[in-house]
């Protein structure tokens, strides 16, 4: 692998046979025998879009998600917990299957939230905190700022509604 760093623009050019990839140097991560840059914008909703993640539960969700990230060794780059859904911008290793990551986060978070707040089960008849679906979108260097602005805008939009 031939590497050339262009310090003027802070880009790294990686020549892999005939293909040339240009990636911002600060977004590259290194593993044993591989270089990667994998970020995802993840979104999932509460069951029935019930607005239950309020009154401090949003802060608890953030803390629990940070602990899960440390335990499972992925990075949360940005996070917004809305009353009825969660936005995450995550950076993970190529070995992670995104569907497994989401299952881990949703399952562990629901289990912990129901243990700490059993009253949630009454608000969400059926005993499920999350809708079974989710959205996972890859994020590039170019789209990262748009995703971050969108996530911040969601919080501002919610404040204006109330």
Locate predicted features.
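Basic nucleic-acid-binding interfaces
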Residues: 2-162
